[in-house]
Amino acid sequence: ARTSRLLEAQSALVTNQSSRLRVARAMYAMRFPGEDVSVLTMQQLRGREGARVRAAYREVARDYGVEWKSRNYKPDDFEAGDDLNMALSAATACLYGVVHAVVVALGCSPALGFVHTGHDRSFVYDVADLYKVEIAVPAAFRVVASESVDIGADVRRAMRDAMYDAHLMERCTRDVHRLLDSRGESDTDYLVDIVELWDWRGN
């Protein structure tokens, strides 16, 4: 980014308890519209988010006819989980990579999260969660349902196509501005940075 405006806004918002909670509520509302979360605490938000995500996993499992038990994996051992957990790990890794690139290109700090804290990619996880249930989870289940013999490679291809179809970078840029910038503007400088990351024409 050619300006520090978003980073300054992010820093101001995350260091104030009231504004941090306000952004966290806005993130929840973007993921699950139609719910009134205006009075929920951070702990209540996390609890409700967890319940909604578990329900989403069960729904996608039914859609693809795949048995779903629970999220069970070892971050340092990709092949330790079953096929579905490996697929979910690969899909979320792809999503995190793209979101991280956008966050950095916009000049934001990957570490200053609102819901997630204490990690050098906390804000990346916050933003990625906006799209995980929509993009990453279905891609993972779809690959497993196809009886793939190369989970990692097939999930990467599925995520490439899903992120392209969803215009993820464009949406991510807009959503970060919406969350951090009270003016809700997308400067030309920011958009140039994003276009340079990924040519949507496939080049």
What is the meaning of each model-derived region?
Residues 1-203:
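Active-site helix-to-loop segments that bind/position phosphate- or nucleotide-bearing substrates
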